[in-house]
Amino acid sequence: MWGIVPAAGRGSRFQPLAFSKELLPVGSRTLNDTQRPCAVSEYLLERMIRGGADKICFVIGAGKSDILEYFGGHFGGADLAYVVQPRPAGLCDAVFRARALVAPGDTVAIGLPDTVWFPDHGLAALPDDKLSFLLFPVQRPEQFDAVMLADDELHVTEIRVKRPDPGTHWIWGAFKMPGAVLHELHQLWQQRNERDEYFGTLINAYLASGGEALGIKAGEAYVDVGTLQGYRAAMLMLSDTPPGSEAMPTTASSEAASIEVRT
């Protein structure tokens, strides 16, 4: 199984920053009886590995070689690869930069490296043979990509990208699909003149053309670390929850707009 990690963005919400935002220290881990800072993107890699990934591809931009230097060619039980997005051109463009590595018979998971979410085994709840989204309930869905479901509470009918009135509190935090579907989506994106910056609008076109997607309500807590507010929230949530721990966060900051915990 492949994991794709789009990490080519400039991190404008955190500028000026002397290193890639995917390497922001959030929490810590113990290595050889010594605690060391943990880069925020390590949490996504660990979740991908727990979900079955044995190969992970970072999509990086020019000037972000520090990610390669930090991780090298291996992390946990997964081999790492790197491809380059020459200029920031949206999530769709970034993800499809890695498509040549993914065979139609592979399974692929995609997540955002500046987020932390629980449970850390959430990707295992998604099927391997269908396009499916790991959903999280949040208080401010207008800040994210809200996912509308059919009456069966399973099939996706629409993704509402950062709408002021999304009509649901459920957003996607990661998604998974067969490699064949990734290639179908790329073909559709090309047919649409590559105009889709966000995956949500492309998925809506895919659904309109007869495609199928599932939304799995298995997420419990979600933090966007890409803002200072979210960064503080993640530090609070992870202060007693190191990477690799199965424990759920027990506290949440009332100040944090981007931390969401469901009990």
What annotation goes with each model-predicted range?
Residues 23, 147-151, 215:
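A structural signal for short hydrophobic beta-strand segments in well-ordered beta-sheet cores
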